[in-house]
Amino acid sequence: MGFNVPVINRDSEILKADAKKWLEQQDNQKKCVLVIVSIALLLDNMLYMVIVPIIPKYLRDIHNYQVTFEGYHNETSQLANGTYLVREVGGRINFLDEELELGWLFASKALLQIFVNPFSGYIIDRVGYEIPMILGLCTMFFSTAIFALGKSYGVLLFARSLQGFGSAFADTSGLAMIADRFTEENERSAALGIALAFISFGCLVAPPFGSVLYSLAGKPVPFLILSFVCLADAIAVFMVINPHRRGTDSHGEKVQGTPMWRLFMDPFIACCSGALIMANVSLAFLEPTITTWMSEMMPDTPGWLVGVIWLPPFFPHVLGVYVTVKMLRAFPHHTWAIAMVGLAMEGIACFAIPYTTSVMQLVIPLSFVCFGIALIDTSLLPMLGHLVDTRHVSVYGSVYAIADISYSLAYAFGPIIAGWIVTNWGFTALNIIIFATNVTYAPVLFLLRKVHSYDTLGAKGDTAEMTQLNSSAPAGGYNGKPEATTAESYQGWEDQQSYQNQAQIPNHAVSFQDSRPQAEFPAGYDPLNPQW
């Protein structure tokens, strides 16, 4: 017997046995997997965005940059006692290479994530989903703790890059685990939609979370909180480890996933990957540039309102996830149309952003942008799992590594490209480019209409081929009337009889060395005699 648990007044061993029994049920396992993966994705995106309000000010406070003073002039005044007071006024402080160093610090996580993802997908396909996820979450715990305690730019850059290494394992294995546990199409779409909602929530709640805690308790506190949540989530993964889930195939051999390079060659997967990149380019372009544009075009906007401009669009994003899941259930063969509408909607909304003149007006196109992103992500991520199921091997590590690479490409190079475009051509040109690229890529998704029809035709073709092969086999062709044996009837005969318990053929009958049921003929049968 264990100890008595206070409040609920129950023995600890009984509670442990009840919890184990509850976890052994498949539906409860699925719920736990979804909660664990959603928390992991929430943490990863919070770590990506929480530094936005903290690090620029922190690097200035620790005197990380060389400083020059520009535009100052002396102003002299005489006090009543005859003392002259000289002040420098009218200038500004220039922090040398600030944008460059901030850009590398922001992009280092996504850049390393791009390079690690091919290896993480390969490892996940070989060893399963749970252990790589634990590795990724533990790496995120250590890297975030280092980031919390680091006091120099070099240490912060190292910790930030290490976060990308952990995210490459945690994100990919999390999405693959959902696809592996939720095998039914509608169920998988709903689960991935919930995970995507947590991704969006992490991106939107992280800046206010970091800003408030940084102002109240200093830099280490928000990062230490996130690091210990990472550790707790890694411990929770041990509850859902199922080492026997990915076993062997019908021949007793371990199932091997399709190599990533071969998945890249699949035109349907390549089309989905491109759409995921285009969907996230808008956010990757707008997030680092819209604040500066608002300060120029809407100078009377309070600073706190600029910081929470992305919070209202979170609700349309959740609504988009819900609508997409419902539409996929009603129109399962029109996934491509939902994604096409979302991409076009996103581009048109970006085109309208530069023409807004108030915060309330700006919220409307941003809401449509997030709604369109929800349509694209929620429809295409389940399709990646479906493509692997129908065209490759049902091992999901590499295909969701491709999805993670798509996100990382957008967020690694998006801020750099957007900054260059805004500097040379302006913010309006940036949004026109987003509109043009999204609307141009949207018709490409029309190629995905063949995904489900290909699956149907392939199944019919396989059945017809099996029927033809069995029709030409010697099982039923010796009586002059070839008998077609379908794959189902042949499999059913194998299930009912084993090779050792076949019906014994009399000695005077003609026997054939074949494992399937044979026709029996009377003694003296001559197949070449036309009398027979």
From Swiss-Prot:
GO terms for molecular function: acetylcholine transmembrane transporter activity; xenobiotic transmembrane transporter activity. Keywords: Cytoplasmic vesicle, Glycoprotein, Membrane, Neurotransmitter transport, Synapse, Transmembrane, Transmembrane helix, Transport. GO terms for biological process: acetylcholine transport; chemical synaptic transmission; nematode larval development; regulation of locomotion; regulation of muscle contraction; regulation of nematode pharyngeal pumping; regulation of neurotransmitter secretion; synaptic transmission, cholinergic. Residues 53-101, 152-160, 214-219, 287-303, 357-367, 413-418 are lumenal, vesicle. Changing residue 230 to F: In p1160; severely uncoordinated. Residues 1-31, 122-130, 181-191, 243-266, 329-335, 389-393, 441-532 are cytoplasmic. Coiled coil: none annotated. InterPro entries: MFS (IPR011701), MFS_dom (IPR020846), MFS_trans_sf (IPR036259), MFS_Vesicular_Transporter (IPR050930), Multidrug-R (IPR004734). It is found in: Cytoplasmic vesicle, Secretory vesicle, Synaptic vesicle membrane. Disulfide bonds: none annotated. It is a multi-pass membrane protein. It comes from the Eukaryota. Detected in most regions of the nervous system including the nerve ring, the ventral and dorsal nerve cords, and the pharyngeal nervous system. Expressed in most cholinergic neurons. In addition, expressed in SIA, SIB and SMB sublateral motor neurons. One of its GO terms (cellular component) is organelle membrane. Glycans are attached at residues 74, 81. Involved in acetylcholine transport into synaptic vesicles. This is Vesicular acetylcholine transporter unc-17. It comes from Caenorhabditis elegans.
